[in-house]
UniProtKB/Swiss-Prot annotation:
Keywords of this entry: Electron transport, FAD, Flavoprotein, Transport
GO terms, molecular function: electron transfer activity; flavin adenine dinucleotide binding
Source organism (scientific name): Bacillus subtilis (strain 168)
Protein origin, superkingdom: Bacteria
Textual note on the cofactor: Binds 1 FAD per dimer.
Function: The electron transfer flavoprotein serves as a specific electron acceptor for other dehydrogenases. It transfers the electrons to the main respiratory chain via ETF-ubiquinone oxidoreductase (ETF dehydrogenase).
SUPFAM superfamilies: Adenine nucleotide alpha hydrolases-like, DHS-like NAD/FAD-binding domain
Protein family (similarity comment): Belongs to the ETF alpha-subunit/FixB family.
The keyword Electron transport belongs to this UniProt entry's keyword annotation: yes
Coiled coil: none
One Gene Ontology term from the biological process aspect of the record: fatty acid beta-oxidation using acyl-CoA dehydrogenase
Residues annotated for FAD binding in this entry: 262-290
Stated name of the protein: Electron transfer flavoprotein subunit alpha
Length: 325
C-alpha cells in the first residue's frame, strides 16, 4: 500500500531550489505507489507549480499571500499545519536548510511527532522507511526508523539524486485559502549582506580559504578560480574570525554543512570543526604549504605548495580548458 508524502518546496528569487527536487525524489522513494504532494508558499508561486510535477510530484498545493513573500515561522507554520491536518500524510519532508531547520521542529512539536534531521539517504526496508544520517561530525552514520504514525524529516542538500525532469508528467495544481492570524513577525525589508553568487549550501563546486589566505585580499585568487569554475566561495572559521571574510561563508560545525561534488581547500589546516562541515564532499582537493596538515588525511588529492602560486596556475589551466571546450 502506497503512502502519502508532503514535500515543502523552497523558492529563492522566484525559482525553486535544487533541494526541493531532491526532497521530491526522497518523497517518491517513501511513497512507493502512493501520492507525493508538493506545497509552495509565497507570493505568485502558481507559475512555478508545474515544475514540481515535472520532477515527481503528483499534486501541488499553492498558498499565496503578500505576507508570505518572505519566510516567517508564524506564517509558514500556519499554512503547513492546515495542509497537514487536511491531507493527513504519512511523512512530511523538508530541505535541511535554514528554513527547513527552523520550521520543521516547530511543526513537529506542535503536532506531537518526532523529527529525523539531516538525512543523506532514504530507503524502504521491510515496509519501514529508513533514514541514514551522519553522526559524530560525520565519522559514523546511523540508520533511523521512526515509530511515529507521521514522519517528519529534513534532507541534506546535494545527497539524494533528484529525478530527471519529465515534462510529460501531469498532475493537479490547487490553491489553498490563506487566512493568517496573529502574525508576530512581519518582514519589512530584506538586506543582503553578501554579493549575489552561487548558493553555498547547494553548490556543486566550492573553493574555500582558511587562515592561509592571510588577508581579505588573499581571497581574490580564490574568487577568480571560483568564477572560472562556476563555484561558490567558502571559508573556515579561522578565516572568518580573522576578519578575512564574512561569517556567511563559514563552513564547519558552527557554520554551513556542505556536500559538493568538488571541494578545493586552500590554506585550510583541517581542524575537526571544519571537517565536520565538508568531509562528505565527493572529491576533496587540499592545497597547503604544511605537508603534515590534517586536511591531507581526508583529501582525495593533495598539493603541497603556496596557494598564491598554485591557485593562479589552476585558474589559468581551467581557463584554457574552457576555451578549448
Amino acid at each position: 500500500m502506497g503512502k502519502k508524502v508532503i514535500v515543502l518546496g523552497e523558492i529563492r528569487d522566484g525559482e525553486l531550489r535544487n533541494v526541493t527536487f531532491e526532497a521530491i525524489a526522497a518523497g517518491r522513494t517513501i511513497s512507493g505507489d502512493g501520492e507525493v504532494i508538493g506545497v509552495l508558499i509565497g507570493e505568485n508561486v502558481q507559475s512555478i507549480a508545474q515544475e514540481l510535477i515535472h520532477y515527481g510530484a503528483d499534486k501541488v498545493l499553492t498558498a499565496e499571500d503578500p505576507k508570505l513573500k518572505t519566510y516567517t515561522a508564524d506564517g509558514y507554520s500556519q499554512v503547513m499545519r492546515g495542509v497537514i491536518e487536511q491531507e493527513n500524510p504519512d511523512s512530511v519532508i523538508f530541505g535541511h536548510t535554514a528554513m527547513g531547520k527552523d520550521l520543521s521542529p516547530k511543526l513537529a512539536a506542535r503536532l506531537q511527532t518526532g523529527l529525523i534531521s539531516d538525512a543523506i539517504d532514504v530507503s524502504v526496508t521491510g515496509g519501514n522507511v529508513v533514514f541514514t544520517r551522519p553522526i559524530y561530525s560525520g565519522k559514523a552514520f546511523e540508520r533511523v526508523i521512526s515509530t511515529d504514525p507521521m514522519i517528519f524529516a529534513t534532507i541534506r542538500p546535494n545527497n539524494i539524486q533528484a529525478s530527471e525532469k519529465d515534462t510529460s508528467r501531469s498532475g493537479s495544481i490547487e490553491s489553498i485559502d490563506v487566512s493568517l492570524t496573529d502574525l508576530r513577525t512581519v518582514i519589512q525589508e530584506v538586506v543582503k549582506k553578501t554579493a549575489d553568487g552561487v548558493d553555498l549550501s547547494e553548490a556543486k563546486i566550492i573553493v574555500a580559504g582558511g587562515r592561509g589566505v592571510k588577508s581579505k585580499e588573499g581571497f581574490q585568487p580564490l574568487q577568480e578560480l571560483a568564477e572560472v569554475l562556476g563555484a561558490a566561495v567558502g571559508a573556515s572559521r579561522g578565516a572568518c574570525d580573522a576578519d578575512y571574510c564574512d561569517y556567511a561563508l563559514q563552513i564547519g560545525q558552527t557554520g554551513k554543512v556542505v556536500t559538493p561534488d568538488l571541494y578545493i581547500a586552500c590554506g585550510i589546516s583541517g581542524a575537526i570543526q571544519h571537517l565536520a562541515g565538508m568531509s562528505n564532499s565527493k572529491v576533496i582537493v587540499a592545497i597547503n604549504k604544511d605537508p603534515e596538515a590534517d586536511i591531507f588525511k581526508i583529501a582525495d588529492y593533495g598539493i603541497v605548495g603556496d596557494l598564491f602560486e598554485v591557485v593562479p596556475l589552476l585558474t589559468e589551466e581551467f581557463k584554457q580548458l574552457n576555451i578549448h571546450s
